[in-house]
Amino acid sequence: MPTSSRPPRRGAPIPALRFHWLTALYDPLIRTWGAAATMRAAVIDALDLAPGMRLLELGAGSGRLAIELKRQHPDVELCAVDTDHAILQIARRNAARAGVDIAFQHGDMTCPSELGTFDRVYSTMVFHHLQPAAKQQALTTACRALRPGGSFVVADFGRPRGLLQLALFGLIQQPLDGFRNTAPHRDGRFEHAVRSSFGQVRSAAVWKTAAGTLEMFVCKP
């Protein structure tokens, strides 16, 4: 089997579409997902931005959220980090076409390089790709990266709301991203980890989708 066809090694983050060779299809597919635009708008609103703020995105993906954010708030400074070189190449191309200035960096979201320097940290649809221990490490990173008075916004799969959402999550999302990685989202352990990592946490939005229930939290240390 070619190396590019293999699933990621044990303990590594799951790529956007599970296999690295499918990464090129991620951007066209995500544009067809109706919940993506709704989530992007909600996250940007929840960040409550002002000119001059410094932002960190954990898990840049193809850059769609970062690009939309910079279009609406050109006077913020934005650094977007991802572990996947291929998806970062896509993100940089998308940003160049959009004419926005974003610092896309390859890095481990569980190992911060700059502590206490960001006004806002945010992450969308990334944590369900991470192993359970890495989820907690990334939450710690988000908290430690914030300046006093800063906030963290995270949107990802949450506890399924109802039997249909539970079934959809189990049939679609869990096989795609791995049962071990996604189980904490299904059973509430991810929400508990978020609430345990920050002093103030509020659930700001819940969306039911064809792959399961999404939830957005706004957090302060």
Where are the predicted features?
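C-terminal alpha-helical "lid/dimerization" subdomain adjacent to the S-adenosyl-L-methionine
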Residues: 10-13, 155-211, 215
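Conserved SAM-binding strand-loop segment of SAM-dependent methyltransferases
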Residues: 98-110
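Conserved class I S-adenosyl-L-methionine
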Residues: 2-48
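Conserved SAM/SAH-binding beta-strand->alpha-helix loop
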Residues: 84-86
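A short glycine-rich, Lys/Arg-flanked "PGG" loop and its adjoining helix->strand segment in the class I
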Residues: 136-148
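Conserved SAM-binding loop of SAM-dependent methyltransferases across substrates and taxa
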Residues: 62-73
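A short acidic, Gly/Pro-enriched loop at the edge of an enzyme's catalytic core
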Residues: 113-121
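Conserved SAM-binding loop
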Residues: 91-92
